[in-house]
Curated annotation (Swiss-Prot):
Protein name as annotated: Testis-specific serine/threonine-protein kinase 3
Result after altering S166A: Abolished autophosphorylation
Function according to Swiss-Prot or TrEMBL: Serine/threonine protein kinase required for spermatid development and male fertility.
Bridged cysteine pairs (disulfide): none
Binding site for ATP: I16, G17, E18, G19, T20, Y21, S22, K23, V24, K39
GO biological process, alphabetically ordered: intracellular signal transduction; protein phosphorylation; sperm capacitation; spermatid development; spermatogenesis
GO terms for cellular component: sperm flagellum
Domain Protein kinase positions: 10-265
Length: 268
């Protein structure tokens, strides 16, 4: 592996992330003269569904996306032993999860600045006909004051001609919308909007809005609606946005366009 990357101009460094069928390592690119991240995917190590369905989708999608709030993919390589290497932009500030874990709840102004960028990234994706389907704090990376979305491993290109309804459960339970958890045919874009609500809640409260250790209890909590710790003093406008994002009825839940017009995001 190291020899293959070295021959392509990459000096491998430490592991910075690990997924089910992949790991991400830091590397130095002689070609770009900068540090990069390399996602290493072992085609031999994954199940058939992953290799046949999810991996080709991810590779197709990351080739086409180009937005300042989405991690850029510079190059794709494949070695003879069945490993795929995605050479990507490195976000050196870690992810939102670690930021909140180490520093506690974010001030509302900082959460707003980051969340605005997530809205822009998802607005761009949905405009390109792509649903991310695995939005969570760990997939929102930080580079200074900038937020950059990563990991399109569960992403899907939606058919243009008709409204897409999916029954596939993707992503993490804690960030999954009620209709996704229940296996009801759903609009994946509305699922992304729900997940964004969970991300914003975690940014502001440093805790999850619903207990993900018990799915039936979690579904009941989701239907009951979200509540906020009073000591954090979250503004009324922000609470209103969170309630809309975490609307259990997917028909009533706003689209990403509608989210982008919300007064909380418009105010400085």
């Amino acid at each position: 592996m190291e020899d293959f990357l070295l021959s392509n101009g990459y000096q491998l460094g430490k592991t910075i992330g690990e997924g089910t069928y992949s790991k991400v390592k830091e590397a130095f690119s002689k070609k770009h003269q900068r540090k990069v991240a390399i996602k290493i995917i072992d085609k031999m190590g994954g199940p058939e569904e992953f290799i046949q369905r999810f991996l080709p989708r991810e590779l197709q999608i990351v080739r086409t996306l180009d937005h300042k709030n989405i991690i850029q993919v510079y190059e794709m390589l494949e070695s003879a032993d069945g490993k795929i290497y995605l050479v990507m932009e490195l976000a050196e500030g870690g992810d939102v999860f670690d930021c909140v874990l180490n520093g506690g709840p974010l001030p509302e102004s900082r959460a707003k600045a980051l969340f605005r960028q997530m809205v822009e990234a998802i607005r761009y994706c949905h405009g390109c006909g792509v649903a991310h389907r695995d939005l969570k704090c760990e997939n929102a990376l930080l580079q200074g004051f900038n937020l950059k979305l990563t990991d399109f491993g569960f992403a899907k290109v939606l058919p243009k001609s008709r409204r897409e309804l999916s029954q596939t459960f993707c992503g993490s339970t804690a960030y999954a919308a009620p209709e996704v958890l229940q296996g009801i045919p759903h609009d994946s874009k509305k699922g992304d909007v729900w997940s964004m609500g969970v991300v914003l809640y975690v940014m502001l409260c440093a805790s999850l809005p619903f207990d993900d250790t018990d799915i039936p209890k979690m579904l009941w909590q989701q239907q009951k609606g979200v509540s906020f710790p009073t000591h954090l003093g979250i503004s009324t406008e922000c609470q209103d946005l969170l309630k809309r994002l975490l609307e259990p009825d997917m028909i009533l839940r706003p689209s990403i366009e509608e989210v982008s017009w919300h007064p909380w995001l418009a105010s400085t």
